[in-house]
A protein has these predicted regions:
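A short, N-terminal "cap"/entry segment at the start of jelly-roll beta-barrel domains
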Residues: 1-32, 111-120
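Short, charged/polar surface micro-motifs in flexible loops or helix N-caps
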Residues: 28-30, 37-39, 56-60, 67, ...
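Short, conserved beta-strand element in jelly-roll/cupin
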Residues: 35-36, 45-63, 97
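Short acidic-glycine-tyrosine-enriched beta hairpin
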Residues: 64-80
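A cytosolic small-molecule/anion-sensing beta-strand core signal
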Residues: 27, 55-56, 71-72, 90
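Conserved short histidine dyad/triad with adjacent acidic residue
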Residues: 16, 30-46
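Ligand-binding loop in jelly-roll beta-barrel domains
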Residues: 80-109
Length: 120
């Protein structure tokens, strides 16, 4: 069934941080929605590129050779194999487009790893 998605309404349903939800599917990829605040772990993805789109807020992506600041309406693609660390001083709403096999923590498995993201 084809249906539209209201991004604002979907984000209102998310009440926690660093727990990506599936907002849609595109071929072999998920469109994930997540609220974040604070710092995440350094990690990389061995086999998948990862796209971060900032819907609300300001996101800092730390890289081993610097950092990139993303504001509302901006996105970045982190190529596979590149270590990165997302940081949000204030609450940030992100859309992520990534293959279904992508773990949110990449090559690291810990208490923040979401093995089976739920739909929203």
């Amino acid at each position: 069934m084809i249906s539209k998605v209201n991004i604002k309404d979907k984000f209102l349903q998310i009440n926690d941080y660093w727990n990506p939800r599936i907002g849609g599917e595109l071929n072999d990829s998920y469109i994930k929605m997540v609220k974040i605040r604070g710092g995440f772990i350094w990690h990389h993805h061995d086999h998948e590129d990862e796209m971060f789109f900032v819907w609300r807020g300001k996101l800092v992506i730390r890289l081993r050779n610097g950092e990139i600041v993303l504001n509302e309406g901006e996105f970045i693609v982190i190529p596979k194999g590149i270590e990165h660390q997302p940081i949000a001083e204030e609450e940030v709403h992100l859309l992520l487009i990534e293959p279904k096999t992508t773990l949110n923590t990449g090559n690291v498995v810990n208490e923040r790893t979401v093995l089976n993201p739920q739909g929203i």
